[in-house]
């Protein structure tokens, strides 16, 4: 949102469109907050467990794969891509990244560093991705404060 960009002193061009068919000049960086099953929001939205089906995860994973492929095509050489979902499902997180790395030889992980985790360093995986679980709490806070579940990976293109 514009107010968040302003508050953080950042400038960005935001696009809201069908990214699977977007034709444009390449970008330096892309944030792909992919549509997902929202299983990471169960703490706040317990109905997700009853309204989402396994077939929903499968369909969403297919869409995420297409969005990832298109986002990678739209990156400049040495560009960066942050992929995230509010899903707890590996098919929508870790497996998406593994498969994208296999499909795109120029793609590489750009590991998230501990100091970038803002009090949730326990969520950092050995591969430098973030797997935030609803029972986690920011360092120094009670686990009762709760967070939504997320998966976050940062990727880059080699020259």
Give the ranges of each region predicted by the language model:
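S-adenosylmethionine
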Residues: 1-159
